[in-house]
């Protein structure tokens, strides 16, 4: 083998070793963060929120009674502008 082939082989070896160490480090980091998240959630859990009372339902007739004059005025305005 020539010196270039040996250097290329060592370069690939170092590259794969470096990539392997980075991969292992990132996987350990992921598991450590997940573990810390579980620990924090277990130690400092939020109290359950009290259910909010449901708003009273408004009668649809009441809504229509309030909107009817506005609808009539809008139709009248439209018909006046576009004969």
From Swiss-Prot:
Its EC number is 7.2.4.2. Its main location: membrane. Its cofactor is Na(+). It holds the Pfam family OAD_gamma. The keyword Cell wall biogenesis/degradation does not apply. It is found in: Cell membrane. One of its GO terms (biological process) is sodium ion export across plasma membrane. One of its GO terms (molecular function) is sodium ion transmembrane transporter activity. GO terms for cellular component: plasma membrane. It catalyses: oxaloacetate + 2 Na(+)(in) + H(+) = pyruvate + 2 Na(+)(out) + CO2. The chain crosses the membrane at residues 13-33. InterPro entries: Na_pump_deCOase (IPR005899), OadG (IPR023424). It comes from the Bacteria. It is a single-pass membrane protein. Keywords: Cell membrane, Ion transport, Membrane, Sodium, Sodium transport, Translocase, Transmembrane, Transmembrane helix, Transport. Belongs to the OadG family. Catalyzes the decarboxylation of oxaloacetate coupled to Na(+) translocation. Heterotrimer of an alpha, a beta and a gamma subunit. This is Probable oxaloacetate decarboxylase gamma chain. It comes from Klebsiella pneumoniae subsp. pneumoniae (strain ATCC 700721 / MGH 78578). The gene is oadG.
